[in-house]
């Protein structure tokens, strides 16, 4: 199966599907259609009925081959790649039997070094796909697409493997947070699903952050600095004051595990006006609400010193911890856990310090945990995919549909 995985991942990663957060269309970029149309064609060649809507959501069905009435399971992956780094002219490189030593990426000065990326030490002996140092790889999440496609191919070639109805979904714009926004849960018509969008071997994730964005706008009064005493209000300094009142230890670079944070993403302005953009994250719903409350309290504390209330705050929720919707349905986690155990894969159920499409889909009525893909260092030139771990991910998909047919 390795050769098929390499071939398919190479073909998909060389198609530029970068999304654009500034766009208002869905998909956010026309080039995402290039991969969507290819996948539609390949699914049809496998004999699967497909449904590609005007927003770039591609659904397909592998019909049940058993008489029993068992739950319909879905497998999801996103076609877009991150806007954080160059995604054009991707030139995948293959490392056979990785020796665990630093590896120079193409003709660049970039080096894939286990001292910097210690997870590489667990991949000695694996076949890796890496970049040439000039682009990201796009294994996030084209590895997930490959794994789903190869699992479907295998099931088609092995009709003796019993399974219920399987729904497949390939979606746009996950990297800019819009993946589920126009996802039609009723049209997808699955009882539950799994995103193939994790990273390291053994990841099985069903806890995500609660997430919000806070935009703070500071309005100043700009007068000539020579006569500014008791008249000027410097919006930039108001912004600095605002940020200084947040806990210095509760930032991404000083937190881990279940610890939440405030993250200042952008700060720009002039004396007249300054804008601060934060993301707020916490796994615990009560702490999440307290974090948002703290933002409002700081606004009020600063505004209390002025007559015209110069600091404005706009907070918008982005997604919530999917555990709230998944934990009441333990069989959704028990199924992959049984499969992992059968395949001798150690299950890592640590919470996601982020979110997936499943974070939103779970609150839309489609409970959706996340499973590993075997890739790492997403969104940049050091991205890699372990073909060996990808092969295990394919086996997990096959094992899940077998388990559902046998035990439900």
Swiss-Prot record:
NCBIfam families linked: peptidase-T, PRK05469.1, PRK13381.1
Q: Where does Zn(2+) 2 bind?
A: 140, 175, 379
Q: What is its EC number?
A: 3.4.11.4
Give me the residues that bind Zn(2+) 1, please.
78, 140, 197
What's its top-level EC category?
Answer: hydrolase
Q: Where is the active site?
A: 80, 174
Entry note: cofactor:
Binds 2 Zn(2+) ions per subunit.
Query: Which species is the source of this protein?
Result: Staphylococcus aureus (strain JH9)
State a single Pfam family of this protein: Peptidase_M20
This entry's Gene Ontology molecular function terms read:
metallopeptidase activity; tripeptide aminopeptidase activity; zinc ion binding
Q: What is its biological role?
A: Cleaves the N-terminal amino acid of tripeptides.
Family listed: Belongs to the peptidase M20B family.
List the coiled-coil residues: none
Q: Where in the cell is it found?
A: Cytoplasm
- Judging by the UniProt lineage, the source's domain of life is Bacteria
- Kindly list the GO CC terms recorded for this protein: cytosol
Q: Which GO terms describe its biological process?
A: peptide catabolic process; proteolysis
Keyword terms, alphabetized: Aminopeptidase, Cytoplasm, Hydrolase, Metal-binding, Metalloprotease, Protease, Zinc
Respond yes or no to whether keyword Kinase is given for this record.
no
Q: Which transformation does this protein catalyse, written as a reaction?
A: Release of the N-terminal residue from a tripeptide
Which cofactors are required for activity?
Zn(2+)
Name it. Peptidase T
